[in-house]
């Protein structure tokens, strides 16, 4: 396996540093996740050690060892319909990733969105949102707080753009993945405005101005967009999605 060399180190030095670059770093991480999700992939192990900086200062996602593929059914379930094992790093895992019975929910963008919320909270405050987790003794309480959505709001009182960050964390750290922010675009809308634009951008799906389109969210064509109005215009009135049997 060959990967791009990232000479700038990982995200750890920025945790709780108060750096003015943190909103920009968050934006770059989200753009990376967006590129991943539009291709049907879910990272499932987002944490400081897995975000590296290139020589130009751009943040890059790394370590896809336990990434999930929405296009592969066996990523989501074993032959019994339940996940084989629990993978990930407990401090950053959403409740459904810890629950063996909810394995199908871990191959959704909402898994990474929860992990991003934990990571962004740690970047801003220097601490984890659900309390200390320096040893196994604190794990059960940490997970209980995560399951209840009991993240430490007091840590945000001194932050600039506090209300925006609160809304972002409320949407990212919701314990119910169905009520959580459903896409990276939603998270970006709540990210405090920054003046600097990243040098590199991930894939962004085209937008339609007139007419209708359909975006495939499951299967081998995940992320593909069909411009329905154009198809109808040229006489194609039957659109077959998926394999013909």
Segments predicted by a language model, with ranges:
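Protein kinase catalytic-loop region centered on the HRD/HxD motif
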Residues: 31-41
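Conserved C-terminal C-lobe helix
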Residues: 160-173
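Conserved short submotifs of the Hanks-type protein kinase catalytic core
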Residues: 1-10
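Conserved activation segment of eukaryotic-like protein kinases, specifically the C-terminal portion
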Residues: 80-97
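Intrinsically disordered, low-complexity acidic Ser/Thr-rich regulatory segments
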Residues: 189-245
């Amino acid at each position: 396996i060959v990967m791009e060399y990232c000479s700038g180190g990982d995200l750890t030095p920025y945790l709780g540093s108060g750096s003015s670059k943190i909103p920009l770093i968050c934006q770059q991480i989200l753009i990376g996740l967006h590129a991943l999700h539009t291709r049907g992939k879910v990272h499932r192990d987002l944490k400081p050690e897995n975000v590296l900086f290139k020589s130009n200062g751009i943040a890059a996602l790394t370590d896809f060892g336990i990434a999930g593929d929405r296009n592969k059914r066996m990523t989501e379930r074993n032959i019994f319909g339940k996940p084989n094992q629990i993978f990930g790093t407990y401090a950053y895992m959403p409740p459904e990733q810890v629950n063996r019975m909810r394995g199908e929910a871990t191959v959704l963008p909402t898994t990474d969105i929860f992990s991003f919320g934990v990571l962004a909270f740690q970047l801003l405050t220097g601490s984890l949102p659900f309390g200390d987790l320096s040893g196994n003794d604190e794990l059960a309480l940490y997970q209980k707080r995560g399951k209840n959505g009991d993240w430490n709001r007091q840590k945000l009182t001194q932050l600039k753009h506090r209300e925006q960050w609160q809304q972002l964390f409320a949407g990212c750290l919701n314990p119910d993945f169905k009520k959580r922010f459903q896409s990276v675009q939603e998270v970006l809308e709540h990210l405090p405005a920054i003046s600097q634009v990243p040098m590199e951008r991930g894939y962004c799906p085209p937008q339609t101005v007139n007419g209708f389109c359909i975006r495939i969210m499951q299967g081998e064509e995940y992320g593909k967009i069909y411009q329905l109005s154009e198809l109808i215009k040229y006489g194609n009135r039957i659109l077959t999605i998926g394999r013909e049997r």
